[in-house]
Amino acid sequence: MRFLYPTFTVEKYDAYLTEMIPHNYKQIAVFEQDVCVGISGLWSGTKLWSGKYMEIDNFIVHPDHRKKGVGKMMTDYVDAKAKETGCTMIVLDAFTENFTAHRFYYNQGYVPKGFHFLKIINKEGLS
């Protein structure tokens, strides 16, 4: 997590997971010799406009392991899981300035569809 959110503490991570897991949140990870080199959260749900969907949340590959197939392995797993569970689509967010992620997602078949708008209510509470 520290590569995406450098100030994120283990305590905050644990507290968030405790809150998220009861709401259909799962995580997948890739390990190399007991070291986590890739991790992502997954949500699934149903929306009126899409039906059942799967959402990738906080997709992170350790910088030393990028361009080695770890991200592809993870998206392939998500693709298979989404098909297996009857989802119509997979969705995700990427920070607007994260051009490396944009290129990766384009290469995996993802396309931008609209904008993700947000309104900050409590800036201090952000990760």
Q: How should each PLM-predicted stretch be described?
A:
Residues G45-I56, R66, P112-K113:
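A conserved beta-turn-beta hairpin within the catalytic core of GNAT-like acetyltransferases
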Residues V61, K67-A80, R103, N107:
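Conserved acetyl-CoA-binding loop-helix of GNAT-fold acetyltransferases
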Residues M1-G51, I120-I121:
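Acetyl-CoA-dependent GNAT
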Residues C87, T96, Y105-F115:
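Conserved acetyl-CoA-binding loop of GNAT-fold acetyltransferases
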Residues V91-A101, L118-I120:
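Conserved beta-strand-loop-alpha-helix junction that forms the acyl-donor binding cleft
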